[in-house]
Design a protein with these regions (language model features):
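Left-handed beta-helix
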Residues: 1-109
Length: 109
């Protein structure tokens, strides 16, 4: 389904944003990223090649390139580092910083 990008949002030409995703004011989606059925609040950022499905990113939250989120809620100003895979309804507190490859949950279970 269609996606909605609000004022000053940036979505790379080769990003796949669909499934009713809302990209908030000033939020961004990098090249090659996939965002489906998700909400990116104002100023949130999804890095190149990241995958975000059925998730919520709080204001100013950052998902680093190549990270994957499936059914996750990420608090305001949180940072999800490269190589993290979050799934199964995981919640990340506002301001939390997950260093690269520190969390890996399979979304296949």
């Amino acid at each position: 389904g269609p996606a909605l990008a609000l004022a000053d949002a940036t979505v790379a030409d080769d990003a796949d944003v669909s499934g009713g995703t809302v990209v908030g004011v000033g939020a961004s989606v990098g090249g090659g990223a996939t965002v489906f059925g998700s909400v990116l609040f104002d100023g949130a950022a999804v890095g190149e090649g990241a995958v975000v499905r059925d998730s919520i990113l709080g204001r100013g939250a950052i998902v680093a390139p190549g990270a994957e989120l499936h059914d996750a809620v990420i608090g305001d100003e949180a940072y999800i580092g490269v190589g993290n895979e979050l799934a199964r309804g995981i919640r990340v507190w506002p301001g939390t910083r997950l260093e690269p490859t520190s969390v890996r949950f399979s979304s296949d279970v």
